[in-house]
Amino acid sequence: MTDFKRIPPEQAHAMRNAGAVIVDIRDPHSFANGHISGSRHLDNHSLPDFIAAADLDHPLIVTCYHGHSSQSAAAYLVNQGFSEVYSLDGGFELWRHTYPSDVEHDEQQ
């Protein structure tokens, strides 16, 4: 894959269930208030360690608020060597409406 692909929540859900990693690039407060179950928060501080430890060939799904910022982040991750990157269309907002029972909240806020 030389570029990322945009995918709907249904495809992201199936891919996540098959082992794809989901990274959430929203601000820490928004992530703490609700995020896709099993997703990992990714920001400028955690990015270098994430890239260093990641399997660059493992499917990676990027989510943001509405599916716009995730496209830039997905393109960046492709440029960093990730071979299978996806941007979640509709972002977390569409996910939480599509799969409300598949949302986690951090205990400490």
From Swiss-Prot:
Catalytic activity: thiosulfate + hydrogen cyanide = thiocyanate + sulfite + 2 H(+); thiosulfate + [thioredoxin]-dithiol = [thioredoxin]-disulfide + hydrogen sulfide + sulfite + 2 H(+)
Record-level GO cellular component terms: cytoplasm
Cited PROSITE patterns: RHODANESE_3
Any one GO molecular-function label of the UniProt entry: thiosulfate-cyanide sulfurtransferase activity
Active site: C64
Rhodanese domain sequence ranges: 16-104
Any single Pfam family the record assigns to this protein: Rhodanese
SMART domains per the UniProt record, alphabetical: RHOD
Record keyword Transferase present: yes
Location within or outside the cell: Cytoplasm
Keyword RNA-binding: no
Transmembrane segments: none
Keyword vocabulary terms for this entry: Cytoplasm, Transferase
GO biological process annotation, one example: glycerol metabolic process
Main location: cytoplasm
EC numbers on record: 2.8.1.1
Domain of life assignment: Bacteria
Its biological purpose: Transferase that catalyzes the transfer of sulfur from thiosulfate to thiophilic acceptors such as cyanide or dithiols. May function in a CysM-independent thiosulfate assimilation pathway by catalyzing the conversion of thiosulfate to sulfite, which can then be used for L-cysteine biosynthesis.
Similarity comment: family membership: Belongs to the GlpE family.
Protein's recorded name: Thiosulfate sulfurtransferase GlpE
Annotated source species: Stutzerimonas stutzeri (strain A1501) (Pseudomonas stutzeri)
Top-level taxonomy: Bacteria, Pseudomonadati, Pseudomonadota, Gammaproteobacteria, Pseudomonadales
Gene: glpE
